[in-house]
Amino acid sequence: CKFATGSEGEKMIISELRVYDFRQFKSVDGAPGLKITFHKGLNALIGENDSGKTAVIDALKLVLLTQSNEYIRPSDEDFYKPVGEDACSEFKIDCTISDFTQNEAKNFIEYLSFNQTENGIEYTLELHYRAWKEGHKIYQELRVGDIDDGISIDGKARELLKAVYLKPLRDAEREMSSGRGSRISQILLNHPAFKDKKEHAVLDIFRDANKRIEDYFIGDTDGKHILQTIRSNLESFSDKGQASNAELKTSDIQLKAILESLSLNAPEINPGLGELNLLFIAAELLLLKDDTDGGLKLALIEELEAHLHPQAQLRLISYLQNEYNENDVQII
C-alpha cells in the first residue's frame, strides 16, 4: 500500500514465504531451504508428488492459523531429518505481508516496518515463527518485526491474520453432517453473524420453543396427563404423605450445541459426490466474505483434484478468480 497516493483498492497479501529446516527443506549456511514469492489473486502450486506443495500450505497454517480454529501444532515430522542422521532440533518459518490499506494497517500499526519509496511509504509485516525441541517436548513462538529482537503479537492482531483453509476432502457428506464438533458448526461459530454467543436471535427462538414444550406438560393436554401419572407413580412408592413436584424440563441452551445440531444438505435426493463437494466448498468460503475488521483475506486450498472432477475444477477456479477481482481475496 502506498499511503502517499491514498490507494485503498488493494488488500494486504502474503508476498513471501521462507522456510528453514522444515520438512524436506534444509537450510544451508543460514539461507532458507525454500523461498516463494506470492502475488495477488490466484497462486497455483504445481509439482510432482512429495515435492513440498503440502509443506508450503502447512507452513502458512502454522504461522497464520485458520479461521475455523483447527488444532494446529508442530510435530516431530516437521523437523528436517537428513538420511541416516538425527532430525534437526529447530525449524523456522518467515512470512512477509505487504500491500496494506489504511483500514488494515491500523490493526497492526505497532508491528509494521516501513520503507520510503518514490511512490510513498510502503508498509510490511514481518512474521517470524520458530519451533524447537527440548527433550520430548516441542515448543513454538511467533514474533513480529526484527528477526532477532521481535515482539509477540497480541490477540486481536493474531485473529486478523487467520486464513480460510480447505483441507483435502475425503467425505463431504460426513463433514457437513450434524454432530459434536462438526465442520459446519465450526464454520458458523466463526462467522461474524454468530459473534454474539450469549444473546443471539437463534437462542431466543430456541428459548421460546423450549418454553412451549415445557408448557405442553403443564397445560390441559395429554402432556399434563403424562406428568401427573409420573408424579402419582412416584408418590405411591415414596414416603407416605410426601407429594411429588417432578417436572419435565428442557436442557440449558448454548449456541454451540444448537449449531452442532445442524446439517448442510443438498436439495437433490442422493446427490453425487461432486455436488456434495461443491456444497462443502461453498460453506467453507463463507469465512472469506467478511471484510469489516480489516483482516487478511487468504484462502488456502489443498488438493483441489480431491474435491472435484476436471470440469468442476475449472468452474471453481473461474469463480475464485472472479472472487479476487470483486473482493481482493488471495488464493494459494
Label for each model-derived stretch:
Residues 12-13, 32, 87-93, 121-125, ...:
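Residues at beta-strand starts and edge strands
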Residues 1, 57-119:
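Conserved P-loop NTP-binding catalytic core
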Residues 92-94, 98-207, 211:
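Electropositive, glycine-dotted interaction segments
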Residues 1-65, 259, 263-332:
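Switch/communication elements of ASCE P-loop NTPase nucleotide-binding domains
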Residues 51, 61-69, 100-102, 134, ...:
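Non-catalytic alpha-helical coupling and interface elements of nucleotide-dependent molecular machines
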Residues 1-11, 175-179, 185-301, 322:
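Extended helical coiled-coil dimerization/tether regions that scaffold
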Residues 76-81, 145-153, 249:
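Short alpha-helical segments and helix-capping/turn motifs at coil-helix boundaries
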